[in-house]
Amino acid sequence: MSKAIEMKQQVVTEIADKLRESKSTIVVDYRGLTVSEATELRKNLREAGVEFKVYKNSLTRRAAESVEMAELNEFLTGPNAIAFSNEDVVAPAKVLNDFAKDHEALEIKAGVIEGKLVTLDEVKAIATLPSREGLLSMLLSVLQAPIRNLALATKAVAEQKEEQGA
């Protein structure tokens, strides 16, 4: 087998592993972004813990078919880049959506969230969700509210009794 074919097979395996393991995968068309804009986007994604790579569409199609995500193939036309996140489902959608608002050249095409194909509208909806940390902080504040209210009520009663006794 030739060296080129072996290298392509390794890339297909790499893409297939990333598609299989990632919680969130977003396909974007980066045509029209300047080098500085692309660098800024990569930096923002890296800070969010998201891997951003450009692969040949033909290799990505083979990888998608091998992990039974062939429905992704219809979005693999033109120059594409793929953002993978193994930890946070929301992070790639949020970073890419925010960047696309400021840079019209970046076009979100589709994504795969936990193995399910999602459209542009669904990616935008996911981008508006708070991150995992944000959701946990909301949950904690909801859980703390009754205790805080009880403590404040008890304190108010104690202060009222002090005023009446003084």
UniProtKB/Swiss-Prot annotation:
SUPFAM superfamilies, sorted: Ribosomal protein L10-like
Family annotation (InterPro entries): Ribosomal_uL10 (IPR001790), Ribosomal_uL10-like_sf (IPR043141), Ribosomal_uL10_bac (IPR022973), Ribosomal_uL10_bac_type (IPR047865), Ribosomal_uL10_CS_bac (IPR002363)
Gene3D superfamilies on file: 3.30.70.1730, 6.10.250.290
GO MF term list: large ribosomal subunit rRNA binding; structural constituent of ribosome
Pfam families registered for this protein in UniProt: Ribosomal_L10
One Gene Ontology cellular component annotation held by this UniProt entry: large ribosomal subunit
Biological process terms in GO annotation: translation
Key words, A-Z: Ribonucleoprotein, Ribosomal protein, RNA-binding, rRNA-binding
Family: Belongs to the universal ribosomal protein uL10 family.
Subunit: Part of the ribosomal stalk of the 50S ribosomal subunit. The N-terminus interacts with L11 and the large rRNA to form the base of the stalk. The C-terminus forms an elongated spine to which L12 dimers bind in a sequential fashion forming a multimeric L10(L12)X complex.
Function text: Forms part of the ribosomal stalk, playing a central role in the interaction of the ribosome with GTP-bound translation factors.
Protein name according to UniProt: Large ribosomal subunit protein uL10
Gene responsible for this protein: rplJ
